[in-house]
Curated annotation (Swiss-Prot):
GO terms for molecular function: ATP binding; magnesium ion binding; UDP-N-acetylmuramoylalanyl-D-glutamate-2,6-diaminopimelate ligase activity. Pathway: Cell wall biogenesis; peptidoglycan biosynthesis. Meso-2,6-diaminopimelate binds at residues 393, 417-420, 468, 472. This is UDP-N-acetylmuramoyl-L-alanyl-D-glutamate--2,6-diaminopimelate ligase. It comes from Acidovorax sp. (strain JS42). ATP binds at residues 112-118. It is an enzyme of class 6 (ligase). The lineage of its organism: Bacteria, Pseudomonadati, Pseudomonadota, Betaproteobacteria, Burkholderiales. Carboxylation is probably crucial for Mg(2+) binding and, consequently, for the gamma-phosphate positioning of ATP. HAMAP family: MurE. Catalyzes the addition of meso-diaminopimelic acid to the nucleotide precursor UDP-N-acetylmuramoyl-L-alanyl-D-glutamate (UMAG) in the biosynthesis of bacterial cell-wall peptidoglycan. It comes from the Bacteria. UDP-N-acetyl-alpha-D-muramoyl-L-alanyl-D-glutamate binds at residues 29, 161-162, 188, 196. It catalyses: UDP-N-acetyl-alpha-D-muramoyl-L-alanyl-D-glutamate + meso-2,6-diaminopimelate + ATP = UDP-N-acetyl-alpha-D-muramoyl-L-alanyl-gamma-D-glutamyl-meso-2,6-diaminopimelate + ADP + phosphate + H(+).
Length: 501
């Protein structure tokens, strides 16, 4: 370590970078342009420090690396420095580098096992509608999440729910410079645990729900919860929106009472600061009454599923926390359409109804099937479920999802999702361990064939849920991604039946 300059404070690191970097900061050596700074730490799949040579060859003016365990990389030179705890400090460094961009944005951060994507997308969509029409002072809302970064629907894919802190702070700066005044972001438990949001000023934190997921990353449910819970102790947080129908949410709400936060409880089941009542299915979607104290308004939505009512309440409460009047918040929500890959439907006369949804946890699959059950009953048809589970992810949920599918659907085809590095048949076997052998559950390892099979056999009045991949346009197996879209395969299968979707 004698030849490697060691920094001791965050400010020292920022100053060191400013003295050398004339471009921007990057955490991916392949994106380096001459004059850029490269930040490298050990990751889950690769160690960024192994790519310092590549970064330098591409013109990096400075490389800031994690100090701990750096010796094997034999790094040296005036353009390389080390900082202990770099990964956790990068968010603060990036925020400082890009001029603290979230001081110019109202950031709404959504956390929870399910519902983050829909809630964040709808927040951005609703606020953008209002900024164009009723409330131009809002000046628009950007989005960061599973579907990408930007202003919906024009998003740049990142491959992560919560991007790395350098990419995130750069995006915030670009949003602020473009004149946007708000940003809705999905705050994943992994993103929070890895400090990707550090350095971000958050105005409103929203909690959707808490069920099993990501136990391939977190050592247990307690650690998974603590990662999400940290969002509600965020420095400078002004408001919190909490779904109290969720037991963990009810406990969180109780903990937050008496704090300085503008606290919004939301509920479909009982008293709350914002409550949904008189929920009914209509031809257009769910209709309901929204009550805030004694003030009530009727909302006709274009979505189905009680979980989506909960998501919409979160959107309304988030807007209310920003000062949007209730009536205008509801006007915007009435115009919201399903999010890509989230209960996205294909409908054609005389053909089964298809719903493509990202549901990839036991609770999300239950909620999706529960939402479609009354639709199938209304049509006088059966409910089908085509799904699989991702490889190299929480394996404990596989039999649970098998049990949910068999319990809720009339016909189940278990297939491949993104097998990644696992054997597809092995994943399917683990899913089937949660089912009882019978004629209602079968397996087809080829996802395209499974979708085709379901839509060839389904009756015209049936409803077919294709779950797990949602918006994704690829399938990942054995280290390769090949083009694959559930929606495209469903359209093709309907076309073979003679239906136009």
């Amino acid at each position: 370590m004698n030849a490697l300059h060691t920094l001791t404070t965050l400010q020292e690191a920022v100053d060191w970078l400013r003295q050398r970097v004339t471009g921007t900061l990057q955490t991916d050596s392949r994106l380096i342009q001459p004059g850029d700074g490269f930040i490298a730490w050990p990751g889950a799949a690769t160690d960024g420090r192994a790519h310092v040579g590549d970064a330098v060859a591409r013109g990096a003016a400075a490389c800031l690396v994690e100090c701990e365990g750096v010796e094997p990389f034999a790094l040296a030179g005036d353009h390389i420095a080390a900082l202990r705890g770099l990964k956790a400090a990068t968010g603060m460094i990036a925020s400082e580098w890009f001029g603290h961009p979230t001081q110019r944005l109202q950031v709404l951060a959504v956390t929870g096992t399910n519902g983050k994507t829909s809630t964040a997308w709808w927040l951005a969509d609703a606020l953008n509608q209002l900024s164009k029409e009723e409330l131009p002072a809002l000046a628009g809302c950007a989005l960061v999440g599973t579907l990408g970064m930007g202003v919906p629907p024009a998003l740049q894919t990142t491959g992560m729910t919560t991007p790395d802190p350098v990419r995130l702070q750069r995006a915030f700066a670009q949003f602020a410079e473009a004149g946007h005044r708000a940003c809705a972001i999905e705050a994943s438990s992994i993103g929070l645990a890895e400090h990707r949001l550090d350095g971000t000023r958050i105005h409103v934190a929203l909690f959707t729900n808490f069920t099993q997921d990501h136990l391939d990353y977190h050592p247990g449910m307690a650690a998974y919860w603590q990662a999400k819970r940290a969002l509600f102790d965020w420095p400078g947080l002004r408001a919190a929106v909490v779904n109290v129908d969720d037991p963990q949410g009810a406990a969180l709400h109780a903990e937050l009472q008496g704090s300085d936060l503008d606290l919004w409880s939301i509920s479909l089941q009982g008293p709350a600061r914002l409550q949904a009542k008189h929920i009914v299915h209509t031809g257009a979607g769910l209709a309901l009454t929204v009550a805030e104290g004694a003030h009530t308004e009727v909302l006709q939505t274009q979505v189905i599923g009680l979980y989506n009512v909960s998501n919409l309440l979160g959107v309304i409460a988030g807007m209310r926390a920003l000062g949007v009047p209730l009536a205008q918040a509801l006007q915007a929500c009435a115009r919201l359409r399903p999010v890509p890959g989230r209960m996205e439907q294909l409908a054609a006369a005389g053909q089964p109804l298809v719903a493509v949804d990202y549901a990839h946890t036991p609770d999300a699959l239950h909620q999706a099937l529960a939402a479609l059950k009354p639709v199938a009953a209304q049509r006088g048809g059966r409910l089908w479920c085509v799904f699989g589970c991702g490889g190299n992810r929480d394996a404990g949920k596989r039999p649970l999802m098998g049990a949910v599918a068999q319990r809720e659907a009339d016909e189940v085809i278990v297939t491949s999702d993104n097998p990644r590095g696992e054997e597809p048949q092995s994943i399917i076997h683990q899913i089937l361990l949660g089912t009882i052998a019978g004629t209602s559950v079968r397996a087809e390892v080829d996802r395209a064939a499974a979708i085709a099979q379901a839509l060839a056999e389904a009756g015209a009045n049936d409803v077919v849920l294709i779950a797990g991949k949602g918006h994704e346009d690829y399938q990942e197996a054995a280290g390769q991604r090949v083009p694959f879209s559930d929606m495209a395969h469903a359209r093709a299968a309907l076309a073979r039946r003679g239906g136009v979707a």
